[in-house]
């Protein structure tokens, strides 16, 4: 699992995710990975939460086929994604973003394993997960978001939000954790392309990195 935060409107998408991959049961850190992936020739972004193997399988499939737009991709996903990803048992959601061929407005789609990867068109809004730390006061996060948009500090807002998500997640029992860490990556998708940055590292980045190197899990 992972942290996933996304602001959508008709002209752009701003997405932030962390880079820590953990074992689905023990939540032991396994590696650092990039979870936001681009398909530049159609100005499309694919990312997801849950099974990395499922997400990577779908990205590989997309790159093996002749696709001209997010419209094509969504149509193919509705038909083919369930057949490709049925073998992966972990709860998984795949997100795809791009611009409509006719209106040139941004489209976002979610495909959830528990709904057999049925295509769901996303609303223009701000979505975030995990959500529990704001479950009793969801209005506060929207107020923070609006203030940061006005002040042109959206990247810092997304990083601070993810820090809160990580702090909350780190305190949970192992079977409740999603596992958040590494680097906060932020992507901005617009009509003329996209920009992906490694915004900031979390405080325990070096500690986890040292453990992975020591255990020969990355070299």
Located regions from the model:
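N-terminal nucleophile
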Residues: 1-219
